A protein has these predicted regions:
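C-terminal motif of bacterial Sec signal peptides marking the signal peptidase cleavage site
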Residues: 17-21
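Peptidyl-prolyl cis-trans isomerase
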Residues: 233-279, 308-309, 314-315
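PPIase-associated folding chaperone regions across multiple families
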Residues: 24-55, 159-226, 274-389
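N-terminal targeting/tethering segments
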Residues: 33-164
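Structured segments of extracytoplasmic/periplasmic soluble domains
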Residues: 76-87, 115-136, 144-159, 179-191, ...
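Second-shell loop/turn segments in exported
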Residues: 58-64, 102-117, 126-136, 166-167, ...
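Sec-dependent N-terminal signal peptides
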Residues: 3-13, 24
Length: 389
């Protein structure tokens, strides 16, 4: 339950197919008066969402001269918004997601904009580097792009506020990204992975910790204050005990509200980027065997943390290799991007993204209802056919 909700960079964006609509959008159930897909949305979904301020095919962002169409920008933004809404409702089903709520001191609205920008920056840099190195699209990417009109249904494109042009741009960037990454890590490449490389990375990066968690999700400020006072009492008694480590274990087993405790009784072994930042930062600041003398607060609640010796075998070589590649490639992208000239249009900067989000979730709710009705009708027809036979 401590995993980060969004990882940075291009890889996460491309992990989900552009055409299948994996995951839930978290579309609002209070979807206004919409009962059908508006003709304006069918004509130009971005123009519909922005009340005519921006069209789907116009450039809204440039990176070193690489032009990013609105249909690519809003796909990325809509995808991240859906992911965040899904995460939020899973974390607190009693509350309603909105862009004005905060995560780690930042509104979801700003968090979405930052992630969309950084993701598209990585996409554009991949496109630029691909062009500079005269890369050609892979056969698989060509096939995907050639089949976009058939595989990316109109309602799927509307659902993610995109068009064939936006999808082609992102697919091209993704393919260049994959080729660039493969070249860096293959045998003889600049970052060729050896047994020694993985051994050093494992030694320097694998961490482990146990924690006592008291949840604060959905609690009022007054309730949070009481919970914090309670966990401070636990901490005081643990640190005053003649055997703090044993006392920590006892309180963890008796008081922790971490639902993962049953499957992780010996603590969590993890790599950088796999836990929420507050937890990870606290663990990395401790020595093995040390108990943090301070309460750590995250979006889940209040933690007491004890760093422990990691189980090195808990992280297999393939996971380690994947993490090393991802982290190293992100550093390469960051290096390529540090002097990038990034510009966004005034029309994009001036948008009320809360209003855009509200219109998008209304549209998504209608599309979901249509899909459910079609699925029910198809099942009914299939059942009828079976009975008649």
């Amino acid at each position: 339950m401590l995993k980060r909700i969004l990882a940075g960079g291009l890889a996460v964006v491309m992990a989900c197919s552009l055409f299948t609509g994996c995951g839930s959008s978290g579309a609002s159930s209070s979807a206004g008066a919409l009962t059908a897909i508006p003709e304006e949305a069918k004509k130009d979904v971005v123009s519909y969402l922005t009340d005519g301020a921006i069209t789907s095919e116009e450039t809204v962002m440039t990176v070193n001269g690489v032009e990013i169409p609105a249909s690519a920008y809003f796909y990325q933004w809509a995808y991240f918004a859906g992911y965040l809404a899904y995460y939020y409702q899973g974390k607190d089903a009693t509350d309603t997601f909105s862009l004005d709520k905060e995560i780690n001191g930042t509104t979801y609205k700003d968090y979405l904009l930052d992630n969309t920008r950084s993701s598209l920056l990585a996409s554009a840099i991949a496109a630029q580097k691909g062009q500079e190195q005269k890369l050609k699209l892979s056969a698989d990417a060509k096939k995907t792009i050639d089949n976009l009109a058939e595989s990316a249904y109109e309602n799927t494109r509307l659902y993610y506020a995109t068009t064939l042009k936006g999808m082609e741009f992102l697919e091209t960037c993704s393919d260049y990204n994959d080729q660039l990454k493969a070249a860096l890590f293959r045998k003889g490449g600049e970052y060729e992975i050896t047994k020694e490389t993985l051994a050093d990375y494992r030694k320097d990066n694998v961490m482990a910790a146990k924690h006592i968690l008291l949840l604060t999700t959905g609690k009022s400020d007054e309730e949070k204050a009481k919970i914090k006072k309670t966990i401070q009492g636990y901490l005081d008694k643990i640190l005053a005990d003649k055997d703090p480590a044993s006392a920590f274990e006892q309180y963890m087993n008796e008081k922790s509200e971490d639902t993962g405790l049953a499957t992780n009784p010996d603590g969590y072994t993890f790599l950088p980027g796999e836990m929420v930042p507050e937890f990870e930062d606290a663990v990395s600041s401790l020595k093995v065997g040390e108990i943090d003398p301070k309460i750590v607060e995250s979006s889940y609640g209040y933690h007491l943390i004890m760093r422990i010796e990691p189980d090195m075998d808990a992280i297999d070589d393939e996971d380690l290799k994947e993490k090393y590649e991802s982290e190293t490639y992100q550093k390469v992208l960051d290096d390529w991007s540090k002097d990038a000239k990034v510009e966004t249009t005034k029309a994009l900067d001036d948008l009320d993204m809360t209003k855009v989000y509200d219109k998008l979730t209304q549209l998504q709710s209608v599309i979901q209802a249509i899909a459910q009705a079609e699925a029910a009708a198809a099942q009914a027809a299939s059942s009828g056919s079976t009975v008649s036979e």
